[in-house]
Amino acid sequence: MDNSIHDELFQAIQQFALKRDKRVWQKVQIPSIGISSQHHDHLKKDWTLTQLHIVSCIHTSQNVNNSFLASRLHISKAAVSKAVHALLKHNIITVTKKPGNKKEIFYTLTDSGRKLAALHEQLHEKAKEQYKQLFNEFSIDDLKTVTAFFNLWIKYM
């Protein structure tokens, strides 16, 4: 196989990774759609993608703690702690303990947290629609090749 295509693909992967990393660290402004004015100011803050994904995990799972979040989101426990601290500060989540186990803490969503989780889901649906538009630019065979590439790439990670 021609090495120039390897070089071109490597450059594309690097550019993708850089842009993706930059996007992960940027803040996400939650739109005001579907939020009453009394809740809008509270939820209008800029949230990191990590914070939003933590809210989503808590919304869809039970017995959520730092270890669970770190494992599920493939991030460090320190990153979880930092994001959780901000969510607690803004009354998006609360800490609970199980009877008989005063040491281990779990997270639950507040009413504001449930609203934020719903808004995050709406953002995911919007992103899926944008991806579908992109996918429509390619043939089925092209998409199968890209899918095979990503699945194999994951095995190398």
Curated annotation (Swiss-Prot):
The keyword Transcription regulation applies. SMART domains: HTH_MARR. It is found in: Cytoplasm. Keywords: Cytoplasm, DNA-binding, Transcription, Transcription regulation. It holds the Pfam family MarR. One of its GO terms (molecular function) is DNA binding. Gene3D superfamilies: 6.10.140.1680, Winged helix-like DNA-binding domain superfamily/Winged helix DNA-binding domain (1.10.10.10). InterPro entries: HTH_MarR-typ, Metal_resp_HTH_trans_reg, WH-like_DNA-bd_sf, WH_DNA-bd_sf. Residues 66-89 bind DNA. Residues 6-157 form the HTH marR-type domain. One of its GO terms (cellular component) is cytoplasm. This is Uncharacterized HTH-type transcriptional regulator YvnA. The gene is yvnA.
